[in-house]
Amino acid sequence: MNTTVKRIDPASLNLKEQVVAINRVTKVVKGGKNLSFSALVVIGDPSAKVVGYGVGKAKEVPSAIRKGIEAAKKNLRRINSLDTTIPHQVLGVFASSQVLLKPASPGTGVIAGGAVRAVITACGVPNVLTKSIGRRNPHNVVKATIVALEMLRDRNTVAEMRGLAVEKL
């Protein structure tokens, strides 16, 4: 199965970045302890419905964040959503983290925890209800949220997949 993914050019987008987590990592060696940092960064363009995440590691926090942003630009994905909310309920699973996304009526806003909120606001969904189930590790929660967003299908896509007219759904 040859699936080619069309790469999204980050230069043409108005990307906003958000740091989700910064970890201080210590490696114990013979001469003492080596201190470094890792940063989990989410970037997205709300108007283009594009989101991506990246992890950067460096000896200093700003360098780790910069590397995370560069990694996220190589990992951009387009999201199917309506203007006001998501088309249907979906459950995204990554490792032992699960993220449940539900459509919400206009005016509800984004009801979400830290890592899920960063992804949802980065991709520009204005009204959604979320629930994080299982482990709350920020890395896995971000990945589970993106898995859930990738599973979204609008009416036209479902009709095309089933070979039906949109009116028959």
UniProtKB/Swiss-Prot annotation:
It comes from the Bacteria. GO terms for biological process: translation. GO terms for molecular function: rRNA binding; structural constituent of ribosome. InterPro entries: Ribosomal_Su5_D2-typ_SF, Ribosomal_uS5, Ribosomal_uS5_bac-type, Ribosomal_uS5_C, Ribosomal_uS5_N, Ribsml_uS5_D2-typ_fold_subgr. Keywords: Ribonucleoprotein, Ribosomal protein, RNA-binding, rRNA-binding. One of its GO terms (cellular component) is small ribosomal subunit. The keyword Nucleotide-binding does not apply. Residues 15-79 form the S5 DRBM domain. The N-terminal domain interacts with the head of the 30S subunit; the C-terminal domain interacts with the body and contacts protein S4. The interaction surface between S4 and S5 is involved in control of translational fidelity. Belongs to the universal ribosomal protein uS5 family. Part of the 30S ribosomal subunit. Contacts proteins S4 and S8. With S4 and S12 plays an important role in translational accuracy. HAMAP family: Ribosomal_uS5_B. This is Small ribosomal subunit protein uS5. The lineage of its organism: Bacteria, Pseudomonadati, Acidobacteriota, Terriglobia, Bryobacterales.
